[in-house]
Each structure stands twice: as structure tokens, then as C-alpha cells.
Amino acid sequence: MAEEKSFKYVIVGGGVAAGYAAREFFNQGVKPGELAIISREQVPPYERPALSKGYIHLENKATLPNFYVAAGIGGERQFPQWYKEKGIELILGTEIVKADLAAKTLVSGTGQVFKYQTLLAATGSSVIRLSDFGVPGADAKNIFYLRELEDADYLAYAMETKEKGKAVVVGGGYIGLELGAALKANNLDVTMVYPEPWCMPRLFTAGIASFYEGYYANKGINIVKGTVASGFTTNSNGEVTEVKLKDGRTLEADIVIVGVGGRPIISLFKDQVEEEKGGLKTDGFFKTSLPDVYAIGDVATFPMKLYNEMRRVEHVDHARKSAEQAVKAIKAAEEGNSIPEYDYLPYFYSRAFDLSWQFYGDNVGESVLFGDNDPESPKPKFGSYWIKERKVVGAFLEGGSPEENNAIAKLARAQPSVESLEVLSKEGLSFATNI
């Protein structure tokens, strides 16, 4: 049997949250040999959002070191040597298959045993696959999902070998929109397919979505709405050649990319800690129902102080900030001190083609569109506010400057009162910049 290893702190998972937790442990003075990161991936933590942006653009020839944590915030990049110098043990290519939280023991797929005093669950999410729904042919070659570096490498290789071929993107959310743009930029003929009446329906209003759909159409991307992929045709090599749609149509395809959502990976901890809304229930310090187990990033369901409700957030900004909060809380508790509870302002952003948008707050209540949302404008700039109980609770802005984006963030946190939707529509962005 493999030798048992013991650490004061163990982070399970090797994504963004894990990397930023390691960074904060170092900032808090962790001693060499106290901390280990155990990750299924073969590389140190990196900025996962880059996979659907810079990394997948073949002309850029971007390489991984550019995306190591903490490149996303302009911090020092954490190369493998960074962890070694800090005395942080990186245990890569290692999947934990069993967690006994009562015994504070983890077991890997090869039988290696790890003991800890404090555990941080940073296991992230897994992609939802079409095979999960029993879609015929969903395991064909050249059907891709994007979650990890290896996925991006396989996709990039296919994009190069199938240059000027036909690509079908299944899904109209974040991944669908970003990869649709990336595929087009890499000279593929792109069709997007999604069942909803417009793209990004969890965030976008119909007015916001109409701009992006128009912009993508002007770039030559074909959009098929209101139907789903119901099957795939393959050639003698098992490679996908067609996507069959539920409405009876078929689409030629050399490459298919699927982005239909993710699921938090919490099976290791099942029936050992409290769960809520699909994640591990935590307090405002990311401590679970077990005092020495913390959950950060995608897997944490935490108190959203601003809205007085429990939420789970899948986003890089929260992954970074929850990691920092948890580590600060752990170290403060050890010293008999306390820190303020997590007070998170929801934040989402995306970049595709020459576009760049940011959103802050909550997209609930009535919405008001302002600005120039004509897809054919040379420099489109528009936004939206969400109003609930006569207060502005959310704000979206496309094409904003850093100062303007900061203004909508401040607005979303301040939640100012508003006289009427008409006034807000007329004032537009100036309502935020004058707060």
C-alpha cells in the first residue's frame, strides 16, 4: 500500500479557486510542507476562462504559461516552480475517489492516502454531455466539450485539421457564444443551435440578445433557434458528419462543440456535509456544516448578503474571491480573530470578436434598454438596467470604458431609487456615471 501523506491544509481540485487559495495561503504566511493541492489535471492551476478566449485562437499561438493563475488579475504567474519555492506540494494527475470527512482522510484512485487537518473542496464543475440525455451518436469523434486544457488542445487540433470546414455549436450560452466567435475567427463555417427563443436567456433580455444575434449573423454565423440536437451521423471512421435536429433538419458538420451547462462535482462529499441548491452549503466564510471543511468556487452555496438569500455562483470572479475569503477566514480563526462575512456583488463578463460586456448585480424585475444596440454600428455601445421595487438592482453594459464599468458596478451595489422607467431610459448610462 502507498505511503500515507499528511498535511495541515489540503485543497482538492486544481482549477481557478485552488490556485487563488494557494496564493492567499502564501500571502497569509503558510509554512513549507503545510499545504498540498491534489488535482486530476496534469498541470498547475490556470485561468480557465482563457480556454474559450485567447488559448483557442490558433493565430495567437498562445501557450499555457500565459494563463497560469494569477495572470487573470495581473498578478505573478504561478508556474510549477512557484509552488516548489513556496513549499506547496502540487500533486497532479491524481484523482481523489474517496473522502472520509469524519476521519479527515482522502484516498486516490491508485490507493494513495492523504490526511489533512483542514480541507478546501475546490472540485469545480463537470460539463453536461449529450450522452447524459441518451442522444444517439453523441460519442462520435470530433464532438467536443470545453472544460479543461486537454479539451482545448483536442479542439484546437481539430480546428486546424478541419480548417474552412463546417462547425456546429450546440448551446447558446457563454461557451456557445465565445466558441462560436472563436471558430469563425479561425476560418470555419459556423452554425449555432439552441432551444431557447434567444441566446444567453439566463442573463440577456430579448433586447440585449437581439444585438448579439444580429452581430453574429453579420459575421456570417448561422443561428438556428427553437430546436435541439437529437442525433448525429458519422462516417466509416466514426467521425461526425451531420447533426440531426429535433425539428427534422440536418446540418453538415466536421466539428461539433457542445456547451449546454455544467454540474458541480460534489459526489465525494455526499451525505457527509449539508447541501443546498446543488452545492455544499456554507456560511459567509465558506465553512461547511463540518468545522474543518470549506467549499469554494462552483461547489459552494453561500449566503448572498446583498440579496439575503443562498446562492451558488459559477464564475471565475467568485472562484477567486471565495478562495481568498476562505483562506483568510481559516487563518483568522487559528489566531482567534474574525473577518467580515463575504459580501459578493454578482459579476459576469464576456469578450468575443471586438465586443466586450460586463454585468453587475441581479437581473430581476423590469428591464430598461438604453444606448445604441444596432448590430451594424461601427462602435456599438448600449446597456440595460433591471429595476425591482423602484430600485435599480442590476446593470449591463456593452462597449463600456473601465470607468463606466466601475460606475455600473457601484450602481448595482448601491441600488439607488428611480422615479420611473421612462426617466431611466432617457438618462441611460449617465444615470450610473452621475451616482
From Swiss-Prot:
FAD binds at G14, G15, V16, A17, E41, R48, K53, I96, R147, E148, D298, V316, Y349. Its EC number is 1.6.5.4. GO terms for molecular function: monodehydroascorbate reductase (NADH) activity. The lineage of its organism: Eukaryota, Viridiplantae, Streptophyta, Embryophyta, Tracheophyta. It is found in: Cytoplasm. NADP(+) binds at Y174, I175, G176, L177, E178, R202, G261, E314, H315, Y349. Its cofactor is FAD. Induction: Down-regulated by atrazine. The modification Phosphoserine is found at S417. It comes from Arabidopsis thaliana (Mouse-ear cress). This is Monodehydroascorbate reductase 2. Belongs to the FAD-dependent oxidoreductase family. GO terms for cellular component: chloroplast stroma; cytosol; plasma membrane. L-ascorbate binds at R320, R351. It catalyses: 2 monodehydro-L-ascorbate radical + NADH + H(+) = 2 L-ascorbate + NAD(+). Catalyzes the conversion of monodehydroascorbate to ascorbate, oxidizing NADH in the process. NAD(+) binds at G172, G173, Y174, I175, G176, L177, E178, E196, R202, G261, E314, H315, Y349. GO terms for biological process: response to zinc ion. Keywords: Cytoplasm, FAD, Flavoprotein, NAD, NADP, Oxidoreductase, Phosphoprotein, Redox-active center.
